[in-house]
């Protein structure tokens, strides 16, 4: 089924159970975040952490996918984005389950005593390069404020022994991220390579790491079929969220 353009509003994106305004956020709602929020394993989780929450998209998706006992912390450094995430969450059915923190994750994590069963992040991945239009967008896109070793260290400090740390990255950067994670003691447990269609090479990769060793499951997801409509696999993954699926 093709995605209807009517799910877009001028300042945000309407899902089946919630609306995400993102006009005050550097990075907008996009396929990467939707993929990650729908894909991350949630079975048995009790507490979740969203690092770099932006508009609150991932926290809201996790809230929709989990039962009412699951608590979610969403940490966002940029104050305007954090304020908008809070507004989005306040207007959702899960305001009492999601706590937004305007903070630097590197400092916030040192003050935490709880551990998380699921940590999720759609992290920055560009090295400093082409100048961005705003400092906020630069912060969201570049690894200058949160590099990958620091991100992996943060997650390691607050994850449960059997928990999962999930990210979405461009394919090649994801391969480098995996090598780094393995060198730091993480174990790759789930990997899904994402291609736009059958004729294209994968352009994104979904990765789930755990402190605990175990079998690694990998697969491939194609977003669109030969007719350019969403594939059956992509529809099955995301239909709980997209308004017209």
Swiss-Prot record:
Example of a GO MF term: nucleic acid binding
Annotated keywords: Cytoplasm, Methyltransferase, S-adenosyl-L-methionine, Transferase, tRNA processing
Catalytic activities: adenosine(37) in tRNA1(Val) + S-adenosyl-L-methionine = N(6)-methyladenosine(37) in tRNA1(Val) + S-adenosyl-L-homocysteine + H(+)
SUPFAM superfamilies: S-adenosyl-L-methionine-dependent methyltransferases (SSF53335)
Compartments reported by the entry: Cytoplasm
EC number: 2.1.1.223
Principal cellular location given in the protein's record: cytoplasm
Main EC class the enzyme belongs to: transferase
Residues spanning the membrane: none
A single Gene Ontology CC term: cytoplasm
Keyword Cytoplasm carried by entry: yes
Biological processes annotated in GO: methylation; tRNA processing
Keyword Methyltransferase assigned: yes
InterPro entries: DNA_methylase_N6_adenine_CS, SAM-dependent_MTases_sf, Small_mtfrase_dom, tRNA_Adenine-N(6)_MTase, tRNA_adenine-N6_MeTrfase
Domain of life assignment: Bacteria
PANTHER family on file: TRNA1(VAL) (ADENINE(37)-N6)-METHYLTRANSFERASE
NCBIfam families: tRm6a37MtseTrmN (NF047853)
UniProt-listed HAMAP family: tRNA_methyltr_YfiC
Protein task: Specifically methylates the adenine in position 37 of tRNA(1)(Val) (anticodon cmo5UAC).
Family: Belongs to the methyltransferase superfamily. tRNA (adenine-N(6)-)-methyltransferase family.
Official protein name in the record: tRNA1(Val) (adenine(37)-N6)-methyltransferase
Origin species: Escherichia coli O1:K1 / APEC
């Amino acid at each position: 089924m093709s995605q209807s353009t009517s799910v877009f509003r001028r300042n945000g994106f309407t899902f089946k159970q919630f609306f995400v305004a993102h006009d005050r956020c550097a990075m907008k709602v996009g396929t990467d975040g939707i993929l990650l929020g729908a894909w991350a394993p949630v079975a048995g989780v009790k507490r979740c952490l969203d690092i770099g929450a932006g508009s609150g998209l991932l926290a809201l998706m996790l809230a929709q996918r989990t039962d009412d006992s699951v608590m979610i912390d969403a940490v966002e450094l940029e104050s305007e984005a954090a304020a908008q995430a809070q507004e989005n969450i306040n207007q959702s059915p899960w305001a009492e389950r999601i706590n937004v923190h305007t903070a630097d994750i590197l400092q916030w994590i040192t003050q935490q005593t709880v551990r998380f069963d699921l940590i999720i992040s759609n992290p920055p991945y560009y090295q400093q390069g082409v100048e961005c239009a705003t400092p906020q967008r630069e912060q969201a896109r570049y690894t200058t404020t949160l590099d990958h070793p620091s991100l992996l260290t943060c997650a390691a400090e607050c994850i449960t022994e059997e928990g999962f740390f999930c990210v979405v990255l461009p394919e090649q950067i994801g391969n480098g991220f995996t090598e780094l994670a393995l060198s730091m003691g993480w174990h790759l447990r789930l990997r899904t390579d994402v291609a736009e269609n059958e004729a294209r090479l994968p352009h994104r990769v979904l990765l789930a790491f755990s402190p605990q060793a175990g079998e690694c499951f990998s697969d491939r997801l194609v977003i669109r079929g030969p007719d350019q409509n969403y594939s059956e696999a992509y529809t099955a993954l995301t239909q709980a969220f997209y308004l017209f699926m």
